[in-house]
Amino acid sequence: DVIKAALDAEMGLLKNMGVNVIRQYTGVQPKWIQYIYENYGIYTMLNHSFGRYGLTVNGGWVAVTDYRDPATQELLMSEATALANDYKDTPGLLMFLLGNENNYGLFWAGAETEDFPDDEEKRAFIGEQRGRPMYKLMNDATIKMKSIDSSHPIAICNGDVLFIDIIAEECKDIDIFGTNMYRGASFTDAFKTVKEKLDIPIMLTEFGADAFNAIENAEDQKMQAYYMVENWKDIYQNAAGLGKAENAIGGFTFQFSDGWWKFGQTKNLDIHDNNASWANGGYSLDLAPGENNMNEEWFGICAKGPTNTRGLYTLYPRAAYYALKTAHQLNPYEEGVTPEF
């Protein structure tokens, strides 16, 4: 069985580095969530994209989801209801996650990351007109899912903290604020902001760094490992009991293996592209003035080998894998642990 072969190879590597939960999207059958848990002790956070990449509404494809549309609302509520019913009794399910930085999807379509619009008025207008209905619908879905399954927490996945004031007003029933966040070595004031605005736990649903140095135009494993370790240090220091924001409950490192599909999405899928798609000043080690430095296809803490006839490939851990293996051994809740760990 090709699925079992793929899982056994990857879950073994994940277990070895101390991973205790992975993020999977809907479409994975409950039996595989159970298989991963029973054989490797790894839980699943199950993620419904909630229209992030478009929807088929009344038989027609809609590329950019309009959360104000009644038919769209009905469709997403029915999918959320089915999600809770289908997975509520699955061994190994840890929690549900709704969306994937859907607030960014209000500005651009598709999964390919772009630079963000600078116009504050435009952002605020889109937040009110299109974002507020989306967040309200996410909260409605949360209420419905909790009426079916009261055993699993429900989080949303936001892009950074954009529109957090609207979230505070519209998402009063979510359990956890999930965020995809790329700020460099530190998450700066994120934990404090979430504590002040929402006062619920924060979970990093995506964070990390690529392993390609845009200045040197070459792989740079040390650079990637540095950002990974610094990010985890920040998460740990904001865990409960350590005297800072005390609201961080963990995170999902992005990503386990390189995504060769990320640049271009539908072309050159057999090429490991080194194009830098966007610029981020937080990652200063390979930032040149006026140049992009975020290499979407190089975020894996494992590199991919060639694909065999079964469609499988060998993974080759990078330095970040081993750095994270050490970092994962720390339990911030253990007696005697201090912020200076």
Regions found by a protein language model. Name each.
Residues D1-F177, S186-F187, K195-L198:
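Active-site mouth of glycoside hydrolases
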Residues F254-F341:
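Aromatic-rich peripheral "rim/lid" segments of glycoside hydrolase catalytic domains that contact
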Residues L55-T65, F107-P117, L198-N238, A248-K267:
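Active-site clefts of carbohydrate-active enzymes
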Residues R183-G184, A209:
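Short, glycine-/Ser/Thr-/acidic-enriched flexible segments
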Residues Q73-A80, M138, F191, Q221-W232, ...:
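Amphipathic alpha-helical segments in well-structured domains
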Residues N16-G18, D86-G92, D140-H152, D234-A248, ...:
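A structural motif corresponding to the C-terminal end of an alpha-helix
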